[in-house]
């Protein structure tokens, strides 16, 4: 099975845009028992790509992409487990062609498209320049390293220049195919600038794209790519890339991760082997005494999750996370579920950013898993405004 998976990943690296997904199918998976959930998640190591993790606990129907080589085997496994299934997408290649038209933003930055990295940088520079003479707000575009392909790793720092406030960090684009997280982060920039009360008690660090190389690759080559583009492994030129959110130094390479460079869950050669994870680590080291809240924006389907992910237990801040998370869910309209990360989907995940930061002293850390994957252009603003309402209520709770 591993050999087949390696071959398929090699093929993915050489085909034209979208063509590598010909014959791939996406299944809706409806789980009824905890045993089904436990066993189903173990299939990820065999090349099944979960677009949305199923949750028996919350009645969340999962979406799993299956290559043609795995289809019979996968369906046999589902039958063995008694999992209800239906074909959601018959051919991923055709699906991507049909949905591509609304992916790219036009010449203006209006939250009605998904923008390329260079345009995002230009937009951030424009905002920085617009406020360079302001006396009541300080906006800095800070570069802190470069990717393997030479792109700058940047963040926005927004604050009141006369104060030394606590810090909120918003991180997006750690999984490069989760495009909706990027406008969600940039929307936070706009909201904080417009609503200055959020600068009374906080400096805001906003990273719109943690993984620029992977993000660009999803635009130009493989839409469903999940890693960066590093070639440090022994198969780097054949199977490049590391899953950034498996590369942090907490329970590294143990759960929901892989030692195979050709896996979409590959955790790297060692913790912090990648410039993107070192970038976040350096931010933590710089602001560690001031970080009040850390939020990782992801896109696996309508959850707010808090530590731990690496073990089936809560952190010492369980009660505080639950109370604040409940307020966030309510502010977002009640459409999101709230739980400990490892319990929400019945599986653990090693090497994640929020677990690492919690282990190293950050009191409040959440994943906001934005609802819906392929949000159409006309719906982007509605979706990201809902995310902002959750972030805003969390920040306001500390200002009271």
Task: Walk through the language-model features, giving the residues of each.
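Classical eukaryotic N-terminal signal peptides for Sec-dependent ER targeting/secretion
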Residues: 1-8
């Amino acid at each position: 099975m591993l050999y087949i998976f390696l071959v398929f990943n090699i093929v993915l690296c050489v085909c034209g845009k979208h063509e590598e997904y010909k014959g791939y199918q996406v299944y809706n998976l409806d789980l009824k028992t905890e045993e089904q959930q436990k066993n189903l998640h173990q299939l990820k190591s065999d090349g099944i790509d979960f677009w949305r993790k199923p949750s028996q606990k919350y009645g969340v129907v999962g979406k799993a992409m299956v290559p043609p080589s795995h289809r019979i085997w996968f369906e046999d496994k589902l039958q063995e487990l008694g999992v209800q299934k239906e074909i959601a997408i018959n051919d991923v290649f055709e699906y991507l062609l049909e949905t591509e038209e609304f992916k790219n933003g036009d010449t203006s930055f209006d939250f009605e498209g998904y923008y390329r990295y260079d345009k995002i940088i230009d937009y951030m520079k424009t905002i920085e320049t617009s406020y360079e003479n302001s006396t009541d707000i300080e906006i800095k575009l800070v570069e802190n390293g470069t990717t393997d392909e030479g792109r700058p790793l940047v963040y926005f720092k927004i604050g009141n220049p006369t104060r030394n406030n606590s810090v909120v960090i918003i991180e997006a684009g750690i999984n490069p195919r989760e495009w909706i997280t990027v406008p969600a982060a940039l929307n936070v920039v706009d909201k904080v600038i417009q609503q200055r009360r959020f600068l009374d008690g906080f400096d805001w660090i906003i990273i719109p794209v943690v993984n620029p190389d992977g993000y660009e690759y999803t635009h130009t080559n493989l839409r469903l790519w999940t890693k960066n583009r590093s070639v440090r492994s022994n198969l780097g030129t054949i199977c490049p890339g590391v899953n950034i959110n498996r590369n942090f130094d907490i329970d590294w390479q143990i759960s929901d991760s892989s030692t195979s460079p050709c896996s979409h869950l590959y955790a790297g050669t060692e913790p912090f082997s990648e410039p993107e994870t070192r970038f976040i680590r350096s931010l933590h080291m710089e602001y560690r005494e001031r970080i009040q809240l850390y939020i990782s924006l992801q896109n696996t389907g309508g959850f707010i999750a808090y530590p731990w992910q690496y073990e089936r237990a809560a952190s010492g801040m369980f009660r505080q996370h639950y109370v604040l998370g409940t307020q966030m869910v309510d502010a977002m309209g009640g459409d999101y579920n709230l739980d400990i990360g490892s319990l929400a989907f019945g599986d653990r995940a090693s090497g994640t950013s929020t677990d690492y930061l919690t282990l190293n002293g950050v009191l409040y850390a959440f994943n906001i898993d934005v609802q819906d994957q392929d949000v159409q252009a006309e719906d982007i603003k509605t979706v990201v405004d809902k995310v902002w309402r959750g972030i805003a209520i969390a920040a306001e709770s500390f200002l009271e």
